[in-house]
Each structure stands twice: as C-alpha cells, then as structure tokens.
Regions:
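Conserved catalytic core of the tyrosine transesterase superfamily
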Residues: 1-303
Length: 303
C-alpha cells in the first residue's frame, strides 16, 4: 500500500464513517502530508504498513523545533488516528504512535473580548465602504454581530443559509461539526442587522446561481471564505490598536463568557455552542473567577 492510497482511504473513512467536515479532514491530511514529505526528502522508503515508531519519532523531532507542546500533541494525535485506522482495517498489526509519548500540555484558556472592545471593533467598520457598488461595510457589521450574537464558529457563519433563519420563532438553524444541526436563539438586535443586510446589501449583489440561499456573499455573488473573515477581523483589530491577537473564534469565546458572567446556565451554553461534552464548555468557568466567588458568597449557607 502506498502513502497516497492509504491517505485517500483514510480521508474517505473520515468522511463516510465518522462524518467529519472537510476542514477537519484537511487538517488530518496536512499532518500526514508532512510525514510523507519528510520521508521523500530523506530518501526513506518505509511504507505506511512497515514504518517504525523510530522513524516517526525522528520526523516529530525534526518538525517540532520551535513548536509549542500543543502543536506537537496535535500532530501526534492526527498520526495516531491515521495508524489506528490502518490497524482497524488489518493493514498493519500495531500502531507505532503508541510507543511515542505526547508532550504534557496545560489547558489553554481562550482569549476573550470585553463588551467595550467588541463595540470598538464593530464601530471601526466603515459603513459607507463599497466595492463594486456592494456595501461591504454593512455586510461586515452584520457578520460580526452574528458571530458574537449567536456564538458561531467561522465555518458555521460562512455556511449559514437564508433558509436557516427562523426569525418568527427567534432561532437560526446552524450546521456544525460533522454536519450536526442545532437551533440557536437569535436576539432582536442581530435579527435587525441581518434584515438590513438582506434588504439593502445582498439584494444589490448579482448572486451566482449555486449561492442563491447563502446568506453572506462577497461582491462577486459567491460564498465568503473563512480566510476572508479572518482578514476582516485582523484589519479591524489593527485599526483600533487592539493589544491582543484575535480571530473569529474570539467572538465565540466572548459570547460564551459573557453569557456565563450574566448568569446563564452552563448546559444552555453547551447547547448553543454545539459542544458534545459539557467538559468542553467548562473551560469558560475558569475564565470568570469573580463569578465563582460571587456564587459562593451568594448561595453557600456558610457566608
């Protein structure tokens, strides 16, 4: 079995059997491609069936120079999944990654924005800005209001459809990881901006046929990419001299943190974020020590 054949079969397994998104599959492939390139560069002819843990360990050592433990751990995890698949399919008897120790990593707390910073970023958008007669400033404001107002992942934002909007009921239908769907409440404020965008901006775009139902479009009538959203946010952060590195995911983290600070139930936040496990959502508890202290002072019988 060649590396390309093994990788192709693995990607198909991830898509069909595990129902993973294309972005997640691409992340797995990226790390395995690095291993393949390493073997080619060093004239190592080991196949995926016969490669040893020593060769893989040398590869990890080579690419890990200057890499933080979390990134190293992610690569090892991806390779472990790949070789576990080969073992599962009886292509090889063992998983060589089992003999490689992952670096110890702490649980990184996500960066968040204050409400003031979020307002500063959104207010920095030039609402008069046009490109090919498309008011992209209005569009950008609506996207950021939706990111923060609904706690969406960037992939969920760019894939949002007009048919996913159920404003009369106060919800939107979000397609998350693994094509799993969930209903997320949407505030009247976010609804207002989306309605303005659809009425005044999207209606003026010459929409490509395959994107008739896609909510957020570029000036050519096509779906926005995740990279474009990252670029928009980076530019706005630079304009206001924000002293932290942010991404679209920062708005999602801020959404969850602000809900928790204002008394929302952790399981409700879990459902809105689309986390399968409550332990993933529990990371936000660690962000708000004041809230935890207040809970003890307010509710514990021994004040």
């Amino acid at each position: 079995m060649t590396w390309n054949q093994a990788l192709s079969d693995f990607n198909l397994y991830l898509k069909i059997e595990r129902g993973l998104s294309q972005n997640t599959i691409a992340s797995y492939s990226f790390d395995i491609d690095k291993l393949i390139s390493y073997l080619d560069t060093n004239n190592i002819t080991s196949s995926p069936i016969h490669i040893t843990h020593l060769t893989i360990q040398q590869f990890i050592y080579q690419i890990s120079k200057g890499m933080n433990p979390r990134s190293q751990s992610r690569i090892i995890s991806g390779l472990r999944s790949f070789f576990s698949y080969l073992v599962f399919e009886d292509y090889r008897p063992d998983n060589p990654i089992d003999l490689i120790e992952s670096p110890r990593i702490g649980r990184k707390l996500p960066d968040t924005l204050s409400l003031i910073d979020i307002d500063r970023i959104i207010n920095a958008i030039d609402l008069t800005k046009e490109y090919n007669q498309v008011r992209i400033g209005e569009r950008d404001r609506t996207m950021l209001e939706t990111l923060y107002g609904c706690g969406l992942r960037v992939s969920e934002l760019v894939n949002l459809k007009i048919s996913d909007l159920f404003f009369d009921e106060g919800f939107i239908n979000v397609t998350g990881k693994g094509d799993k769907q969930r209903f997320v409440p949407i505030s009247s404020t976010t609804q207002k901006y989306i309605n303005i965008y659809i009425r005044d901006v999207r209606s003026a775009i010459d929409v490509q046929k395959e994107y008739n139902d896609t909510l957020f479009l570029n000036n050519r009538g096509k779906q926005l990419t995740r990279a474009m959203i990252f670029t928009i946010i980076k530019k706005l952060a630079a304009e206001i001299n924000l002293n932290k590195t942010i991404s679209p995911h920062t708005f999602r983290h801020s959404f969850a943190t602000h809900l928790l600070e204002n008394g929302a139930d952790l399981r409700a936040i879990q459902m809105m974020l689309g986390h399968e496990s409550i332990t993933t959502t529990e990371i936000y508890v660690h962000l708000d020590k004041k809230q935890l202290k207040k809970a003890i002072q307010t509710y514990h019988p021994r004040k």
